[in-house]
Amino acid sequence: MSQQVIIFDTTLRDGEQALQASLSVKEKLQIALALERMGVDVMEVGFPVSSPGDFESVQTIARQVKNSRVCALARCVEKDIDVAAESLKVAEAFRIHTFIATSPMHIATKLRSTLDEVIERAIYMVKRARNYTDDVEFSCEDAGRTPIADLARVVEAAINAGATTINIPDTVGYTMPFEFAGIISGLYERVPNIDKAIISVHTHDDLGLAVGNSLAAVHAGARQVEGAMNGIGERAGNCSLEEVIMAIKVRKDILNVHTAINHQEIWRTSQLVSQICNMPIPANKAIVGSGAFAHSSGIHQDGVLKNRENYEIMTPESIGLNQIQLNLTSRSGRAAVKHRMDEMGYKESEYNLDNLYDAFLKLADKKGQVFDYDLEALAFIGKQQEEPEHFRLDYFSVQSGSNDIATAAVKLACGEEVKAEAANGNGPVDAVYQAINRITDYNVELVKYSLTAKGHGKDALGQVDIVANYNGRRFHGVGLATDIVESSAKAMVHVLNNIWRATEVEKELQRKAQHNENNKETV
């Protein structure tokens, strides 16, 4: 009988560290709920002590996620563990994940300590975390470069202190698969109490071996794999969860393990993470790339037509990718749109049907036929922008030509007031952005601009993703339209609304902090 491998997702913690712009609480929650639908066992959603915003996002997710265990990261520091517990206490089930470096290099140069002191600190902090929960994970940072005898000492001590999961990270992506498997096997041989904890692995892709190392560790006895959707993360990224999950499913014959993942949700979750994080998926990416199930060779095409198993070790349907494209028109009713969303696997709670149908009709009037990829793009943008907007694009007009200076006129609703400005720029998009900056006085600096066609043909929707700097922070915005300048303007307005909301949240947190301080003085 096969054993279950626990899937531990760190997209919202380790994965987010790679992003050019921080995610909002709403965006993090959207990803967390998708991960819950996909069936991850544990999701690590933040580092609460790092900032009030991270604390709030962990607390919000912990309150709303019911079917996955929510986890927060903490260094082996008292305050870290206490703050993590405070952010998680609203959850139905939670885990505290604490860590400390164990390699000679890290101990000597980073911690300026000794192995004995590290073990003593680990014991104390694991016990402190156990005061808050029975589910405590302990990680040996840089375990891949820690001598096996030292690693075994730390692991044994952490388990004795109450750690229920022991994580063995290849923090810098240094080890080879056969080497990493040897580390796991070595721990099983050397640690007498190892049966009292689940052995976990956390691998990085610096040498392109993250997935290989994780699978080698599973083969050697590890029963939890940590990773991120699409492999996002520090430097070259984390272990790609979708790759590990499907490798376990496809090669059950040799690994003899399974996961509790709903494989039908993999593709949608991957696409959502890509969109929200503004990190496009390479076409040749295993499992979820657009070319993962494409066959261009005539020999391969002939073989697939005769029997898909000739050249496909899994099907697009096995990851939830429905390749049947049904087109709708402006004559299609709300029921038809809802029916198509149902067929694509979307629940009503994931989108606002009224808003989606309004956007669908406007698009159908422009391009005639609306396809599945159009609907998905409209649903995504609608979800991103469904909160009340302080800024709203009311009107814009652009004049430009090969020998003309681009000029834009923009009218923007700012709360209850409508303001208008005109400006010149280096092209129509820049002119629109200059006019918007004049209206708001936010003076944002554009850091990144990317345009992606959502669909096919000359009438495809254009999605613009931008990253902008404001007061030392980076904000992401997205816009969608058949007109590139319009989608660019909408993306900047989305950035402005994100800045406004972040500013309002900071003001509210400051008010609460001041209120608490006043109460202390009164007492």
Curated annotation (Swiss-Prot):
Residues 5-267 form the Pyruvate carboxyltransferase domain. This is 2-isopropylmalate synthase. Belongs to the alpha-IPM synthase/homocitrate synthase family. LeuA type 1 subfamily. One of its GO terms (molecular function) is 2-isopropylmalate synthase activity. Its cofactor is Mn(2+). The keyword Metal-binding applies. Mn(2+) binds at residues 14, 202, 204, 238. Residues 392-523 are annotated as: Regulatory domain. PROSITE patterns: AIPM_HOMOCIT_SYNTH_1, AIPM_HOMOCIT_SYNTH_2, PYR_CT. It is found in: Cytoplasm. Keywords: Amino-acid biosynthesis, Branched-chain amino acid biosynthesis, Cytoplasm, Leucine biosynthesis, Manganese, Metal-binding, Transferase. GO terms for cellular component: cytosol. Pathway: Amino-acid biosynthesis; L-leucine biosynthesis; L-leucine from 3-methyl-2-oxobutanoate: step 1/4. It is an enzyme of class 2 (transferase). Homodimer. Its EC number is 2.3.3.13. Catalyzes the condensation of the acetyl group of acetyl-CoA with 3-methyl-2-oxobutanoate (2-ketoisovalerate) to form 3-carboxy-3-hydroxy-4-methylpentanoate (2-isopropylmalate). It comes from Escherichia coli O157:H7. NCBIfam families: leuA_bact, PRK00915.1-1, PRK00915.1-3. One of its GO terms (biological process) is L-leucine biosynthetic process. Coiled coil: none annotated. It comes from the Bacteria. The gene is leuA. InterPro entries: 2-IPM_HCS-like, 2-isopropylmalate_synth_dimer, AIPM/Hcit_synth_CS, Aldolase_TIM, LeuA/HCS_post-cat, LeuA_allosteric_dom_sf, LeuA_bact_synth, PYR_CT. SUPFAM superfamilies: 2-isopropylmalate synthase LeuA, allosteric (dimerisation) domain (SSF110921), Aldolase (SSF51569).
